[in-house]
């Protein structure tokens, strides 16, 4: 169980009325909540969306209305003997309504004495100032190495595909920075083409990463074939790069050697700053991400904060990388 699972369980046990899980991975959020309800038995999970209404409740699949106000009335009346976690999908679209806003604020008080929690799942939402103090925010990071390894192993096992340990390790590392849905997409493509997942899929993973990063409109995945030999001068930097490359080895990790944090390059245009970044990425065999700061802070209020958060999260998930 991860630290994130521990945080979620703690918030639910503490009877936190409304939790906003910041994530675009709706299916993954629902799976994590299902696992949480198993750990926190006898709690049950109910989900709501505007098309299906309330569903996923044991023996009560047709309860509840499609209307957003009705589902809030429903959770308010659920008996304490049936502790419930209610996942509201796309609910942020309705939170500008004064009635919905008032009802949510009322529920933050009502649910403190009840064993129920409301979960709102959304990646991009700028909550009203009136609701800001009543929300508990829980950021869901992209899948970590252990989750990716388990996911790939399960997919291979389900398809009777043999996955060698060294190949699994390489694919796990390559898939860091991808959402669970995108990892499944790469695996499904591999199984359709060759009937198994293998080392050949590393190229597919890199292409999926490029598409994932391109979607952010802020990060760009850069290809590079430059090396330190293409850079004139800067011998001190080149020596440092050669020496510090060893910090990423297993021996250095076991020894406790800290990873290099960054390099500050200062100079006018045309002096090779971007070239050096490309050379570092190629020399250290790491992905190179280009961040467009102008786009990062352009657009609507609230959107730039969400983009910054997503950008940092994506870069951290792809670590080690050159940004």
List the predicted regions and their residue ranges.
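Dynamic helix-loop-helix/coil hinge segments at AAA+ ATPase domain boundaries and subdomain interfaces
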Residues: 1-9, 13-16, 22, 220-242, ...
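Glycine-rich P-loop/Walker A and Walker A-like loops and their local beta1-loop-alpha1 context
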Residues: 1-38, 94-98, 274
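Short linear interaction motifs
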Residues: 1-4, 66-70, 167
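Surface-exposed beta-strand-to-loop junctions
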Residues: 9-13, 84-86, 130, 166
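Walker A/P-loop NTP-binding motif of AAA+ ATPase domains
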Residues: 19, 37, 43-139, 147-161, ...
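Conserved AAA+ ATPase small/helical "lid" subdomain
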Residues: 148, 156-210
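Proline-centered turn/helix-capping motifs that create local helix->coil transitions or kinks
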Residues: 195, 210-214, 251-253
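Conserved alpha/beta core segments of nucleic-acid transaction machinery
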Residues: 206-228
């Amino acid at each position: 169980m991860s630290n994130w699972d521990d945080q979620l369980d703690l918030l639910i046990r503490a009877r936190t009325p409304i939790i906003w899980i910041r994530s675009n991975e709706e299916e993954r959020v629902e799976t994590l909540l299902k696992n949480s309800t198993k750990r926190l038995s006898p709690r049950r999970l109910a989900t709501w969306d505007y098309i299906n209404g309330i569903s996923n409740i044991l023996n009560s699949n047709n309860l509840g209305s499609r209307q957003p106000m009705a589902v809030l009335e429903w959770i308010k009346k659920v008996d304490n003997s049936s502790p419930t976690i209610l996942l509201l999908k796309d609910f942020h679209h309705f939170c500008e309504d004064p009635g919905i806003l008032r009802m949510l604020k009322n529920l933050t008080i009502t649910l403190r004495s009840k064993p129920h929690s409301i979960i709102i799942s959304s990646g991009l939402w700028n909550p009203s100032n009136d609701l800001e103090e009543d929300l508990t925010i829980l950021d869901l990071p992209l899948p970590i190495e252990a989750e990716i390894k388990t996911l790939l192993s399960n997919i291979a096992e389900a398809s009777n595909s043999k996955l060698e340990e060294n190949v699994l390790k390489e694919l796990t590392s390559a898939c860091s920075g991808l959402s669970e849905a995108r990892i499944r997409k790469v695996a499904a493509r591999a199984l359709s083409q060759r009937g198994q997942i293998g080392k050949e899929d590393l190229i597919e993973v890199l292409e999926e990463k490029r598409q994932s990063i391109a979607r952010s409109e802020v990060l760009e995945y850069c290809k590079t074939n430059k090396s330190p030999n293409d850079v004139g001068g800067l011998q001190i930097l080149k020596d440092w790069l050669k020496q510090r490359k060893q910090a990423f080895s297993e021996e250095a990790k076991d020894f406790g050697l800290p990873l290099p944090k960054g390099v500050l390059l200062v100079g006018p245009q045309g002096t090779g700053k971007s070239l050096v970044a490309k050379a570092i990425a190629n020399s250290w065999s790491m992905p190179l991400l280009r961040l467009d700061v102008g786009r990062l802070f352009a657009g609507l209020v609230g959107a730039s904060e969400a983009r910054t958060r997503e950008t940092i999260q994506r870069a951290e998930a792809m670590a080690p990388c050159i940004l």
